A protein has these predicted regions:
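Active-site environment of divalent metal-dependent phosphoester hydrolases
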Residues: 18-20, 44-48
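Short amphipathic alpha-helical segments and helix-helix/interface helices
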Residues: 24-28, 50-54
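Extracellular S/T/G-rich loop segment that most often corresponds to the catalytic His/Ser-adjacent loop
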Residues: 35, 51-124, 140-143
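C-terminal subdomain of the subtilisin-like protease fold in secreted/lumenal serine endopeptidases
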Residues: 3-15, 20-26, 33-35, 60-63, ...
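Catalytic nucleophile serine of serine hydrolases
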Residues: 14, 44, 109
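A cross-domain feature marking catalytic cores of carbohydrate-active enzymes
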Residues: 15, 41, 66
Length: 144
């Protein structure tokens, strides 16, 4: 993505795992060319600083937590400031599914594409703050 991407392009990374300096470095290097990377915070109810690539930080790296329809922090979402940049809808999201179907699912992998879409539309702004963020520093809700 970094080698082929252009400034203004957006990459969605809905993946996660334990801490990996190699993964973090790859995201930081790839984002240095201007591609915006939207990273899922993870679904472990844990500090996102313990998970890669969510803990990667840089000017073009945006880590996304999840909220419900009432702007409440999702019980499963990872947290932490840094690395969390924005919160987006991630609870009970209707999405495409296997074999051409649809399913209603929850996770930061649902929230992160919302944020990527906002960046593709040309920029993000603060739509308020999420309620009940476990780190005590309420994440801003991304909006266009």
């Amino acid at each position: 993505v970094g080698a082929e991407g252009n400034s203004g392009d957006v990459a969605n990374m809905s993946l996660g795992g334990g801490a990996s300096q190699a993964m973090d470095n790859a995201v930081v290097i790839a984002s240095s060319g201007g591609v915006i990377f939207c990273l899922a915070a993870g679904n472990s109810s844990d500090d996102a600083n313990n998970h890669s690539p969510a803990r990667a930080n840089g000017a073009n790296i945006k880590t996304i937590s999840a909220s419900d329809i009432n702007d409440n922090f999702a019980y499963f979402s990872n947290y932490g400031n840094p690395p969390i940049d924005w919160c987006a809808p991630g609870v009970s999201i209707k999405s495409t599914w296997k074999n051409g179907g649809y399913n209603t699912i929850s996770g930061t992998s649902m929230a992160t594409p919302h944020a990527a879409g906002v960046y593709l539309l040309g920029g993000a702004s603060n739509g308020g703050t999420v309620n009940g963020d476990p780190d005590g520093n309420s994440d801003e809700i991304i909006t266009h």
